[in-house]
């Protein structure tokens, strides 16, 4: 089989194996996960000793625990990952969740997780695609998901004009796949508004 990087770049192979692989390439996620797994286990052990945990899904990393342990442990983790995997922390994409203000000792460059809604900051974050935070934060992000699905349904309607049965089959399959995940993992009271909005759009 031809290297995927060559297929994506007009037959020209770029880089060395040690420099990584193409983002979005099918094996990239698995290779990434294996590459930093030893360091992830060490990080988890450190925070687990004080009641915390470190979990990762592909390149999404979540660490919880007392700030005086989490912040130094995360800095050590990223220093080791940089040395072993040549991966750098993107601080602009790293957030700290707190119900109140940013905790004392928060490393520079890390923002508070949440969204500004109607002039009020609502703490929250996305955990494996599921919004977690204040009720306002959760409902806002579920509404965004419904609008995303609605845009896709509109595209289906535009492409399949006049094909009623095909439109219903594809639109239903698409919405079920997109929203079932949220239906199974969000509180029913949070999903109710989003589900009613989806019903109205359909």
Cite the ranges covered by each PLM segment.
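Nucleic-acid-interacting cores, centered on viral/eukaryotic replication and modification enzymes
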Residues: 1-202
């Amino acid at each position: 089989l031809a290297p995927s990087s060559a297929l994506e770049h007009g037959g020209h192979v770029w880089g060395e194996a040690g420099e990584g692989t193409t983002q979005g390439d099918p094996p990239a996620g698995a290779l990434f996960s294996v590459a930093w797994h030893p360091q992830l286990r060490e990080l988890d052990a450190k925070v687990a000793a004080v009641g915390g945990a470190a979990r990762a899904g592909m390149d999404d990393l979540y660490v919880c625990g007392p700030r005086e342990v989490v912040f130094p442990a995360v800095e050590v983790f990223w220093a080791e990952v940089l040395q072993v995997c040549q991966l750098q922390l993107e601080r602009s994409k790293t957030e700290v969740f707190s119900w109140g203000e940013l905790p004392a000792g928060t490393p520079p460059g890390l923002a508070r997780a949440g969204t500004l809604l109607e002039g009020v900051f609502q703490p929250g974050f996305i955990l494996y695609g599921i919004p977690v935070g204040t009720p306002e934060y959760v409902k806002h992000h579920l509404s965004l998901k419904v609008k995303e699905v609605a845009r896709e349904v509109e595209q289906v309607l535009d492409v399949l004009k006049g094909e009623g049965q095909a439109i219903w089959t594809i639109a239903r399959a698409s919405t079920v796949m997109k929203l079932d995940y949220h239906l199974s993992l969000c509180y029913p009271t949070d999903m109710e508004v989003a589900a009613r909005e989806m019903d109205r759009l359909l």
